[in-house]
Every structure is written in C-alpha cells, then in structure tokens.
Amino acid sequence: MEPGAGGRNTARAQRAGSPNTPPPREQERKLEQEKLSGVVKSVHRRLRKKYREVGDFDKIWREHCEDEETLCEYAVAMKNLADNHWAKTCEGEGRIEWCCSVCREYFQNGGKRKALEKDEKRAVLATKTTPALNMHESSQLEGHLTNLSFTNPEFITELLQASGKIRLLDVGSCFNPFLKFEEFLTVGIDIVPAVESVYKCDFLNLQLQQPLQLAQDAIDAFLKQLKNPIDSLPGELFHVVVFSLLLSYFPSPYQRWICCKKAHELLVLNGLLLIITPDSSHQNRHAMMMKSWKIAIESLGFKRFKYSKFSHMHLMAFRKISLKTTSDLVSRNYPGMLYIPQDFNSIEDEEYSNPSCYVRSDIEDEQLAYGFTELPDAPYDSDSGESQASSIPFYELEDPILLLS
C-alpha cells in the first residue's frame, strides 16, 4: 500500500460520515420540525392543564382566543409544518388528498347513490321483519320510504345538486389547503388565519341562522361574498365540513361535541363530515376510542360512510342522514364519548412529555414503525353493515402526528 494511503482513506471515511448519520441538511430539517411541533404541542398541553385546574372550558377558550401572540405563533408553526415537513414525509398518506378522494367517490362516482340505495333496502327490510307497528311508527316509516323513493322528484334533485361545485367548509383551516382544488367552493375558517384567504372565525361560538331558501347558484354567490370576520352562517349551507386535526385541539370532550353538532346543522341532508384526528399507534390499539366516537357522532343524526387508519392518524367520513339532531343526552353521556387519550393524563404526565425532557430513541422509532399498517376501509364501513372491534384504551402523552420522522 502507498505510504499514507490508509490515513487518506480514514479521513475520507470520516468526511463521508457514518452510514446511519443523516446529512447535515436533513439534521437541520428534523431539528426545525421538532422545534415547530414543540410550539404546537405546548399550546395543546397548556390548554389541557388549564382545563384540569379551572374546569370552565368557556372561560379558558375565551382567554385562549384573546392571546393573539400565542395564536399567531401557533398558526405560523402549523403552516410551516404542513408546507415544509408533512408534505415530504406523508407520501401516499396525505390527509388533504384523502378528503378529496372521499368527496370524489361520494359526490361524483356514485358513492352517495349507493349509500341511499342501501338506506332504501334497509327501510324496506324493516317493514318486513319488524312486528306490527303502531300507527305513528308506521306513518313515520312510510314517510321515510317516500323520501328515499327513486321516483321522488326531491330525491332526484338531491342527487343532482352536487353536479356543480362542492361547497366545503374547512374548520381550523390555517392555510386553506382545499382552495387549489377546482371541484370545491371552499370556505376556510380559523381563529387566527395563516393566510389572507382564510376567514377569521371562532367556530365554537359561531351563531347559526335559518337555512337560505335560494337556488344553488345564488347560494354559491352568497358564499363568495362573505364578510370577514364570520360571526354567523345559515344552516344547511355546505355539502362537506372538514375537521382536520381540529377536535384534539380542544381540551374538553364537550367542546368536540359542540363542533360536531354545529357541523350537522351546517350540512345539507346527505352531506359529509370528514374528521381527521392524530394517532401513531397501530390500527387496533385505539379501536375502543374510535368505536366510542362513532356511537357519539352517529347519535347526532350521522352514519359513518368510511373509515381509514394511516400511520399517524384516523380518518372518518360521516354522512348526515337526518335533518334534525337526534341525540338523547338524558339516557347517555354522548359528549363524554368524544374523548382522546390525553384527556386521562395527569399534569405531571403532561410535563414529563415535554420534548426537552424526553426524546424517543431510534430503536423505539423502529418498534413504532413496525406496527404501522393501513386499516382497509371495507370491513369498518358502517354503510356495509360492519362494526369495529374494541380494544383496551391506551393513554398517549403526545400528538405524534406532529413528528412524522
């Protein structure tokens, strides 16, 4: 060997770095992502901590909405995460793309018609299998069958209404990700918008008015002329309402319940509520929680149309099947069923979960990644008559979707 060759080879190897060491640019990107996700998670933790200490979620939320500095910092961090980090690490599992895909399937590719056909078959079957009904129940069922009949002019109009643009309300929109899709007439709202195209609106305190008695093109024109900020909206205005990473933001299950109830009132009959909520555990670990959410949301007058599990989130689509909310809060605590694992953490648990105190090891990351699989839609599709299995609830300390590494 040429003298000094060994030394030169060693130097080259050192310059190249270990094969397991990410390049400097990648390290910088990960550090920035951890910093941004720390901003977001600290806001969530502070809200939950205040809720445990005070208990008055109205007061806590009012103070939170007045803290403009924190809200602006949160909005900038979320937009940066979405623009520069999530889009690069979620290929094939994008939440926005999933929402668009479900809307196309439902409104443009026959999904809505198939769901309504199943409703009609179930109603007909109920008349054959149910013992003698009293006169009131019988007249109710006959009315339901009339509404479902494919010869009913109103039913045909309902099917054709979405032939124009799909009116979509994106709650907690931040940076208005649906604006770029031509098939949507999008209204994005947020308590602190990150871009000018998003309207300022506190959805929890949004006032609802009587539905507009206007033609479809007139309703579209109304939406294009909304004033900023938005304090009130007519009911039955949208074909789609999106809650993307929204419900876990709130510290109280009752606040999540209020959001779902308002979504029901804002949707047209057979409109879709799309819910995405973070969860990095394997597909069955929080099955009990998802079953609980399904029961609570369906009690409002929804029926689940689709469910998917991605590596870092649950994705659910519910269709509005009744004009009135039907939930009976006397016999069952439906709001309490919209829980998240963090609701059960103590203040000490939240403080321990601070990223500066604990960072998951590479081995733990690999073990976590090993359990990541996508849950197929069909077996857990309510419209197919299937149900979801339950499992023991698992308490998580963080919102793992924020660190998609």
UniProtKB/Swiss-Prot annotation:
Bias (Basic and acidic residues) ranges: 25-34
One Gene Ontology MF term: protein-containing complex binding
Xref: SUPFAM superfamilies: S-adenosyl-L-methionine-dependent methyltransferases
GO BP terms in the entry: cellular response to amino acid starvation; cellular response to methionine; methylation; negative regulation of TORC1 signaling; positive regulation of TORC1 signaling; regulation of TORC1 signaling
Class of this enzyme: transferase
Residue numbers binding S-adenosyl-L-methionine: R95, G172, D190, D202, F203, S244
E.C. no: 2.1.1.-
Functional note: S-adenosyl-L-methionine-binding protein that acts as an inhibitor of mTORC1 signaling via interaction with the GATOR1 and KICSTOR complexes. Acts as a sensor of S-adenosyl-L-methionine to signal methionine sufficiency to mTORC1: in presence of methionine, binds S-adenosyl-L-methionine, leading to disrupt interaction with the GATOR1 and KICSTOR complexes and promote mTORC1 signaling. Upon methionine starvation, S-adenosyl-L-methionine levels are reduced, thereby promoting the association with GATOR1 and KICSTOR, leading to inhibit mTORC1 signaling.
Family designation: Belongs to the BMT2/SAMTOR family.
Designated name of the protein: S-adenosylmethionine sensor upstream of mTORC1
Species name: Homo sapiens (Human)
Gene that encodes it: SAMTOR
